[in-house]
Every structure is written in structure tokens, then in C-alpha cells.
A protein has these predicted regions:
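Acidic, polar-rich low-complexity tracts and alpha-helical solenoid repeat scaffolds
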Residues: 1-208
């Protein structure tokens, strides 16, 4: 929005960090004056996010969600993806877990479930030598997910599971069969299938 653009400009030129506190106080006062106006709450979340206060922003999202009961789930989902992109893996996992706790009937459950496992895969494999127990547990969780998510939603799960099997657990043949079966079942969009086939080539090379 125009207001956010202006605030962004002001914050970018805030040399000594004094403006940030003034803006926060002003928004909080507005929220107290008009508690029903969600735009001020969203502005506060945006402000915290700009300042890198992700924990505080996420707590604010939870508070709105509990108060309004509807509509905030997609905001939390988007925020979780943003946290993941900023490598805030633990906070992202927490955000998606919060959504999953709402139950399988919830409209964002599937998306949260897939993102949760995708981040768990990224987090587990981001260390130099992941613990074998962690890898086996991850493999089991991804395998269970494969039977639960819809066919067209399974790309991220398959991609993670193939990588875990082939490059961490030395289960090359299982990884190859998983890819071949998934292609046969038409689980992928054309661009996803290209990536998976390149992965298959890497595994064949490893397997020789």
C-alpha cells in the first residue's frame, strides 16, 4: 500500500533507529482506539516483519486468528513461507504446526502439512552430517505423507523423499522406483517432471 511504501522510505532513512519505536507506538495507539479495525493490526505485523521481529509478528498473527476465528489462516500460511525463505526454519515449522493443530478438515491443513515436511527436510539436510535417526524418521514421515496428500500436490514430498533415499540413506533403487512410479502416475506438472528427471539422471550416475 501507499502508506507502507511511505513508512518503508522513512524506516530506510532512519539512521539512529529512533523512528521505528515512534511508528510502533503510533500503530499501537490506533489499535487501542479502533480494536475492530484489522488493517492496523496487519500494519503492525508488516512493521514487525520489516524490522526483522519475526517472533513478535507471528505472535500478533496468532492473536488475530484467535480473536477473529476466520480468515487469518492464509496469512499465517504466507507468513510461514516467508519465514522459510528467510531461513527461520524453527519459527516456520511452528507456524505450520499451529495450522495443522486446527485439524484435517481445515482449509489450509494440506498446504501446511506439505510445507511443514518440506521445511523439516530442508532443516534436517542443511547440516553437514545429519543424524541417521533423524533421516530415518524424516523418511518415514514423508512416506506417510505420500499416501495422504492428493496426487497433484505430492511434488515437494516426492522430491524430498527421493533426495533422502538416494543421497543420505543409500537407497538408490528405492529412489529410482519412486520417481518412475510417480511419473507413471502423472503426479507432476511438466516443469516439475523435468526437475525430477534430472534428479533421476544424478541417481543413475551414483548407482553405477
Amino acid at each position: 500500500s501507499t502508506l507502507q511504501s511511505r513508512l518503508q522510505y522513512v524506516l530506510a532513512n532512519d539512521i539512529d533507529g529512533s523512528v521505528e519505536g515512534i511508528i510502533e507506538t503510533a500503530i499501537l495507539e490506533k489499535i487501542q482506539q479502533e480494536p475492530q479495525n484489522m488493517n492496523y493490526n496487519k500494519l503492525l505485523i508488516w512493521h514487525y516483519t520489516q524490522a526483522g521481529k519475526f517472533r513478535v509478528a507471528l505472535n500478533q498473527l496468532y492473536a488475530i486468528d484467535r480473536r477473529t476465528k476466520t480468515g487469518t489462516e492464509f496469512d499465517i500460511l504466507d507468513f510461514g513461507v516467508m519465514l522459510y525463505e528467510n531461513e527461520e526454519f524453527d519459527l516456520a515449522l511452528e507456524a505450520f504446526n499451529y495450522l495443522m493443530q486446527k485439524g484435517k478438515e481445515n482449509q489450509v491443513y494440506n498446504s501446511a502439512y506439505i510445507e511443514y515436511l518440506n521445511i523439516l527436510y530442508t532443516k534436517t539436510t542443511s547440516v553437514l552430517n545429519p543424524a541417521n535417526d533423524d533421516l530415518l524418521e524424516l523418511e518415514q514421515m514423508l512416506t506417510e505423507a505420500l499416501n495422504m496428500v492428493r496426487r497433484k500436490e505430492s511434488y515437494k514430498i516426492i522430491y524430498a523423499l527421493v533426495n533422502v533415499k538416494a543421497f543420505y540413506l543409500d537407497k538408490h533403487q528405492e529412489a529410482i522406483e519412486l520417481i518412475e512410479n510417480s511419473i507413471e502416475e502423472r503426479r507432476f506438472l511438466p516443469e516439475q517432471e523435468q526437475v525430477i528427471k534430472l534428479l533421476l539422471g544424478d541417481i543413475f550416475f551414483l548407482n553405477e
